[in-house]
C-alpha cells in the first residue's frame, strides 16, 4: 500500500520495470474501517502519514481483511505506518490469523499522536498468539511486559522454533 499518487506511480513503474508477476498493489490507506482519510503531503515522502487535521490528500481507507488477498498463509508481513499500526491491525483480524511473522517499527511518539500507547499493539498481538522480540543482526530477544523504548524494530512471531530454524537467528535470553 502506497498512498500518495506520486509514490504509487513510482511503485507501479518499478514493478513493471522489474517484470514482477506475483505482486498486487492497492492505492489505499489501511485502517479499522472502510471510509476515507486525509494523508499528509510533506516533501519527504517517507514522513507522510494519516493526517489528524484533515489536511492533505483525501484517500480511501479500507480494512486489510477486505482486500482481495487469497492466501492461506502469510510468512512475513511488514507494517510501517508511522503510528497507525493499531488501526491497521484492528482491520486485519482474519489476515493476522494466517500470518506467521510481522516486522514493524515502533515509535512511541507516533502511537501517542493517534491517542494510544504502543503497549496496546503488543497486547493485541499477544492475544493473537504472537511472541514479541527486538532484534539486531541475527539475534532476537524476547520483549518483557514492561518494555520501554524510544524507537525499536519489533518482530512478532507465532512459531518461534520454525522462525529460528528458517532464519538462523539466535534467541538471546
Where are these regions (language model features)?
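Phosphate/nucleotide-binding beta-alpha loop and adjacent structural elements of enzyme active sites
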Residues: 1-173
Amino acid at each position: 500500500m502506497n498512498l500518495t499518487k506520486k509514490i504509487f506511480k513510482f511503485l507501479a513503474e518499478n514493478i513493471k520495470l522489474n517484470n514482477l508477476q506475483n505482486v498486487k498493489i492497492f492505492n489505499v490507506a489501511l485502517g479499522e474501517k472502510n471510509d476515507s482519510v486525509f494523508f499528509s503531503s510533506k516533501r519527504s515522502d517517507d514522513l507522510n502519514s494519516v493526517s489528524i487535521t484533515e489536511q492533505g490528500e483525501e484517500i480511501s481507507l479500507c480494512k486489510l481483511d477486505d482486500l482481495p488477498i487469497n492466501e492461506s498463509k502469510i510468512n512475513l508481513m511488514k507494517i510501517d505506518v508511522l503510528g497507525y499500526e493499531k488501526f491497521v491491525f484492528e482491520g486485519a483480524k482474519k489476515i493476522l490469523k494466517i500470518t506467521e511473522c510481522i516486522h514493524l517499527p515502533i515509535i512511541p511518539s507516533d502511537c501517542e499522536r493517534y491517542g494510544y500507547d504502543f503497549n496496546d499493539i503488543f497486547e493485541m498481538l499477544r492475544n493473537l498468539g504472537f511472541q514479541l522480540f527486538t532484534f539486531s543482526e541475527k539475534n532476537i530477544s524476547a520483549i518483557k511486559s514492561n518494555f520501554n523504548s524510544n524507537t525499536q524494530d519489533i518482530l512478532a512471531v507465532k512459531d518461534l522454533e520454525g522462525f529460528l530454524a528458517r532464519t538462523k537467528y539466535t534467541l538471546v535470553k
